[in-house]
Each structure stands twice: as C-alpha cells, then as structure tokens.
C-alpha cells in the first residue's frame, strides 16, 4: 500500500524500514541504527549539550515540544524551556524540541535542516574527544540505540569515530 515511510518504523521498526526502502527504491541496506526522542535527549545530555541559535519564532514552538517531552518523562519543564532566541548552549530537551519544529519556516524541509544541524553540532562537539572518551561515550550511548550491527563491526566503528566525526552531514 501507499503509506508514509515513518509508518514502517511504527509498525515494524528498523527491519521493516530497511525492507520498505530496499523494496521501493531498490537500494541495498546492510545495517541501520535508530534512536527515539527519549534516547536522543539523553545522548545530547551525555555529551554536555550543544550550541544552537534558534529564532524567537522557533523557541515559541520548541517550548511546546519541551512541555510535551517533560510531561511524558515526569520532569519539570521550566528548567528546560528556552527563554530567548539567539546563540545559546542547549540541553537534550531543547535540542530535540528544536529538531522537531515543523510549523516555522518552510515546513518539513526546514525541519530536516534543523535535524541535520543538531546532528552536525553533536558531531562537532564530539570531535574534540579522545578515543578513550569516545569509547566511554559509546558504552553509555549504545544501550539507547536500536541497531542490527554486529559487535565486531561496532568495535571497528568505535575505533574509526575520529574519522567518522569529520564527515559532513548532508
């Protein structure tokens, strides 16, 4: 049938997303990794937050997402609310809320741009970490990641993190 790709994720997780992409686009996919909003909040907090520069319009919408995520996690929202637009250090709640905004700017296109920005800022932040720090971070983060990557490949990828973190997200 004709459904959105995110429906495959909701109904069958990573394996169904992979099969859907392979069947519809004839693209082979060897491995996948996925995180949900809760995990992304924790991962961003684990790296110490990131720098973002949201507009006043964006923070109005982002704060609604902050409220929702805090309510679902039984956390006081006031500590995670944006108070103003502009360049600032943000925590996991604020960064995920920023990445979720779809009703400011050019709808979904700008939302995916914000998502790439958050991922790029995370990678930029981790670039200054040593291999030992990156390995410890991977140990903390990996339990939050759903994937089909075998242990041997994961260990190889962790060793290659300094190179991987230099890649540009497009």
Language model features with spans:
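Non-catalytic, solvent-exposed segments at the cell envelope interface
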Residues: 1-170
């Amino acid at each position: 049938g004709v459904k959105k790709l995110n429906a495959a994720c909701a109904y069958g997780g990573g394996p169904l997303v992979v099969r859907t992409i392979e069947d519809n686009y004839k693209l082979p996919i060897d491995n996948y990794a996925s995180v949900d909003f809760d995990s992304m909040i924790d991962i961003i907090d684990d790296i110490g937050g990131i720098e973002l520069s949201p507009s006043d319009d964006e923070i109005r919408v982002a704060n609604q997402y902050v409220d929702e995520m805090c309510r679902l996690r039984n956390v006081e929202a006031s500590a995670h609310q944006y108070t103003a637009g502009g360049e600032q250090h943000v925590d996991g709640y604020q960064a995920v809320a920023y990445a979720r905004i779809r009703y400011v700017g050019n709808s979904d296109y700008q939302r995916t741009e914000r998502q790439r920005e958050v991922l790029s800022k995370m990678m930029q932040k981790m670039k200054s970490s040593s291999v030992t720090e990156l390995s410890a971070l991977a140990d903390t983060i990996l339990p939050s990641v759903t994937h089909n990557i075998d242990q041997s490949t994961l260990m190889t990828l962790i060793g290659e993190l300094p190179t991987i973190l230099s890649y540009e997200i497009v």
